């Protein structure tokens, strides 16, 4: 009787590289395969051109060497959602495992887009093709005679997020990275509380769960709260400003929809500008997830971004820009506007709205400090933290625990303090560290004491 957990990436760090593998007897299933958002900035536009070895060296992708002896035993890989810290390394790593890869439609379409870019730069001698399979929430897939996958819908800050469940002869293994409980989400899925409670009654062997915000003694607010914040701030800014620029996560389709809808009500034409805005926005439009107002434009190539901003600069009060660069990352649209590299001139009459939070890593904090300082020097009006998180707070985590009643818990997707904070919560709920709650770090494995 063997159930082993391999902590491949995301264990002991908050910024990405999320990748976990579970071995059940002689069969292995991989969960997620993400990149480090800040470490990948080292390569800027050349991420696709960089070799796996280079990316591992700077810790931009998971070091999956712990799985090398087990590649032939890998029977499936599952992608929980489409954030880059969960799918960004798929083109670099998963082709080596020669196994089917499952995800929801939005997730799979984004992986396909990344694969198309990867193929352009791949070594001709290397076969990087991956067998991708689209699933719907509630689907079940029998992957081997012993193992079955189930996909439970859950809310998060990106459409079409699921909690993958691996059903084994020893009980269910639930992978809850990432989630929040939001009953008012409009785009994407709502949590299936009924199925989660039912699963708890059937028997959950192991819960692998994110821990990013478990130290915060809150229930994470609904995205409906962010919609009201966006509406309130943009109406205020519209009265006081000529130009309005909003920067947010390109993958946060529901937030982009809310910003665009408010701009439309204010009589401002919408421009989405930036490479990742184009990637996520176009796929979301194709799948019917994003419905931009009439006349809205997406500019994602250097020449179209330049032309679009030039036009908006001449009639600032008629436009609202939704742009990349909320982390201050070099090469994104907002930092380039601030540095005068793009033809949109900021003045004291303009407003910049950050519908985002700063991802807690040293590089991001430094980049944001530089960006904020430059904006202040230009006299621009700034509105920060017009945002709610997509990650579970302490009380969301407590609810998940009480619904699932897992026998064992492994906190993931967090730095050491976050993992410890989850262990503290679990202790409150009657669990004990090193008996049924296990803190793991990258490159380690755990055999469950069955």
Q: PLM features: residue spans?
A:
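Proline-aspartate-enriched helix->loop->beta-strand connector
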Residues: 204-205, 397-414
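Short beta->alpha junction loops
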Residues: 385-392
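Binuclear metal-dependent phosphoesterase catalytic core
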Residues: 15-18, 141, 438-450
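Short, conserved loop/helix-junction motifs that constitute active-site signature segments
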Residues: 93-97, 200-202, 342-349, 402-404, ...
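Short helix-loop-beta junction
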Residues: 117-121, 372-381
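His/Asp/Glu-rich metal-coordinating catalytic cores
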Residues: 2-76, 85-265, 269-275, 279-304
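Hard-cation-handling environments
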Residues: 218-355, 360, 365, 369-371, ...
């Amino acid at each position: 009787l063997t159930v082993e957990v391999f902590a491949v990436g995301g264990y002991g760090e908050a910024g990405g590289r999320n990748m976990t593998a579970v071995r059940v007897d002689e069969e292995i299933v991989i969960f997620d395969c993400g990149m480090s958002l800040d470490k990948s900035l080292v390569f800027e536009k050349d991420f696709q051109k960089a070799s796996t070895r280079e990316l591992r060296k700077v810790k931009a992708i998971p070091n999956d060497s712990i799985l090398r002896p087990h590649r032939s035993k890998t029977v499936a890989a599952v992608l929980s959602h489409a954030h880059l810290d969960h799918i960004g390394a798929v083109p670099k790593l998963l082709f080596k495992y020669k196994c089917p890869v499952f995800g929801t439609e939005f997730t799979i379409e984004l992986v396909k887009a990344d694969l198309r870019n990867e193929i352009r730069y791949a070594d001709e001698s290397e076969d990087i093709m991956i067998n991708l399979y689209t699933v719907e929430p509630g689907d079940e897939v029998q992957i081997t005679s012993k193992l079955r996958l189930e996909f439970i819908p859950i809310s998060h800050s990106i459409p079409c997020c699921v909690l993958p469940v691996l059903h084994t002869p020893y009980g269910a293994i639930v992978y809850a990275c990432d989630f929040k409980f939001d009953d008012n989400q409009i785009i994407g899925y709502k949590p299936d509380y009924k199925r989660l409670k039912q699963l708890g009654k059937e028997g959950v062997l192991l819960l692998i769960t994110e821990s990013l915000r478990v130290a915060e003694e809150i229930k994470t607010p609904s995205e409906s709260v962010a919609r009201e914040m966006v509406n309130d701030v943009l109406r205020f800014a519209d009265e006081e400003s000529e130009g309005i620029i909003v920067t947010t996560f390109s993958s946060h389709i529901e937030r982009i929809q809310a910003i665009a809808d408010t701009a439309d009500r204010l009589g401002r034409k919408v421009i989405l500008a930036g490479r990742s805005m184009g990637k996520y926005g176009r796929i979301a439009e194709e799948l019917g997830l994003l419905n931009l107002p009439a006349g809205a434009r997406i500019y994602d190539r250097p020449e179209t971004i330049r032309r679009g901003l030039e036009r908006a600069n001449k009639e600032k009060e008629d436009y609202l820009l939704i742009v990349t660069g909320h982390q201050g990352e070099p090469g994104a649209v907002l930092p380039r506007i601030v540095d005068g590299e793009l033809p949109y001139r900021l003045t004291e009459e303009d407003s910049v709205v950050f519908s985002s939070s700063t991802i807690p890593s040293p590089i991001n904090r430094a980049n944001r400090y530089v960006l904020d300082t430059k904006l202040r020097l230009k006299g621009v009006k700034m509105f920060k933290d017009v945002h709610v998180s997509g990650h579970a707070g302490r009380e969301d985590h407590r609810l998940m625990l009480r619904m699932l009643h897992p026998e064992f818990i492994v906190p993931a997707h967090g730095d050491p303090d976050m993992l410890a904070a989850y262990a503290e919560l679990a202790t409150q709920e009657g669990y004990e560290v090193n008996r049924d709650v296990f803190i793991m770090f990258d490159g380690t494995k755990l055999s469950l004491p069955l």
